[in-house]
Amino acid sequence: MSRFPRRFIDDSSMEDAGISLCPSIHYRPINPNDLDRLEQIHRDIFPIKYESEFFQSVVNGVDIVSWAAVDRSRPDDHSDELIGFVTAKFVLAKDSEIDDLIHYDSSKGEETLIYILTLGVVETYRNRGIAMSLISEVIKYASGLSVCRGVYLHVIAHNNAAICLYKRLMFRCVRRLHGFYLINRHHFDAFLFVYFINGSRTPCSPLEVAMFVVNYMKSGIKSVASKLANKDEKGLKWLFCKDTDCV
C-alpha cells in the first residue's frame, strides 16, 4: 500500500473553473519554507489528517512533485506565502491502476504516470482560476517528460464542480469506484479521471464502451416509441450522445 494517503481536493476551490486568471498570481515549486503554511491549509480544508511524513516529502521533493500558488501583489512579508497548491507523485505505468487503459511499452520499466494527491486554494482566493492553473502546471510538466504517459486522479462522486473542471481540461472519466473514500465512517464513490499524453490514449475505455451501449439502447427505445406515436414519420432518428464522459 502507498505510504501517501488517498488523494483529496477541496470541493469549494473548484468554484473557479471558468474564471479569468489573475495576473498577480505566480506558480513555483513548494519548498521547505512552505511547511507550516502547507500543513495549515491542509488542516483547514480537508476532511482527513495528513501525517508529518507526507508534508516533509512534499516540501523536500522526496517522491513528490508540487506547485505553489502565491500572490506577488501582497505586502512584502506575504508575497511568497502559499494561497494554493497541488501535490503529485510518480507511479510506474506497469504498476498503476490504469495500466490496462494506456498504450505503453511494458519492456521499458521507466515509463511512468503522474498521480495527483492533493489540490486546494484558500477561501479568499477562490474564483480566480487558480485551481485550473495548478492542474495545468502538472499537465505541462508531465507533457515534457518523454517517459510519462498521463496524469490521473480520483474525485469524490458528488464534487460536480471538480468534475466539470477536469472535463474542461480534457481529462477523461474512465471508471467509477464504489466506496473508494471513507470519510467520517461513511463510504463515498469516486470517479477516476485520466489525462492521456504522449500517445497513450486507448481507443475507448471500458466505461466509455458501457456508456455508449447504454446511450445507444436508450436512443433506440426513444426512436421506436417516436415511430409508434407518429406512423407518418419517415425514418427513425437515432440520437447518440457525443459526450461519453461521466456525469
Curated annotation (Swiss-Prot):
It is an enzyme of class 2 (transferase). It holds the Pfam family Acetyltransf_1. Its EC number is 2.3.1.48. The keyword Transferase applies. GO terms for molecular function: histone acetyltransferase activity; protein-N-terminal amino-acid acetyltransferase activity. The keyword Acyltransferase applies. Disulfide bonds: none annotated. InterPro entries: Acyl_CoA_acyltransferase, GNAT_dom, NAA60-like. It catalyses: L-lysyl-[protein] + acetyl-CoA = N(6)-acetyl-L-lysyl-[protein] + CoA + H(+). Histone acetyltransferase that probably regulates acetylation status of histone H3 during meiosis. Histone acetylation may influence recombination and chromosome segregation. The gain-of-function mutant mcc1 (T-DNA tagging) has elongated rosette leaves, increased stem length elongation, early flowering and reduced fertility and seed number due to defects in meiosis. This is Histone acetyltransferase MCC1. The gene is MCC1.
